[in-house]
């Protein structure tokens, strides 16, 4: 039962953070950032927010990380307005490499298919 609540809160935070990034945060460093997953700690005090960015350049990834860290206060304040929770969890942003990994595997499979 508690695990279900943790999952629901994570999904709601994911939806709201995506919305906040699109509508409220004007920092150009976070343009093109998409939230892919939110993992909540058991006591709902910490949320790991995984994101992807369209660019593969390391400099763009670093800029996006810096922009997200700078916007954390704004995002948390807006979450406080949208969510009915006693305490809004602390947000930690991490780059999600699963999309790039999946694309690499897909490319390898296509290469194998072309060879046969």
UniProtKB/Swiss-Prot annotation:
Database matches in InterPro entries: KH_dom-like_a/b, RbfA, RbfA_dom_sf, Ribosome-bd_factorA_CS
Subcellular compartments: Cytoplasm
The keyword Cytoplasm belongs to this UniProt entry's keyword annotation: yes
UniProt keywords, alphabetically: Cytoplasm, Ribosome biogenesis
GO-annotated cellular components: cytosol
Signal peptide start and end residues: none
GO biological process terms, semicolon-separated: maturation of SSU-rRNA
SUPFAM superfamilies attached to this UniProt entry: Ribosome-binding factor A, RbfA
Cytoplasm keyword on record: yes
A molecular function (GO) term: ribosomal small subunit binding
Taxonomic superkingdom: Bacteria
Family assignment from sequence similarity: Belongs to the RbfA family.
Purpose of the protein: One of several proteins that assist in the late maturation steps of the functional core of the 30S ribosomal subunit. Associates with free 30S ribosomal subunits (but not with 30S subunits that are part of 70S ribosomes or polysomes). Required for efficient processing of 16S rRNA. May interact with the 5'-terminal helix region of 16S rRNA.
Subunit and partners: Monomer. Binds 30S ribosomal subunits, but not 50S ribosomal subunits or 70S ribosomes.
Identification of the protein by name: Ribosome-binding factor A
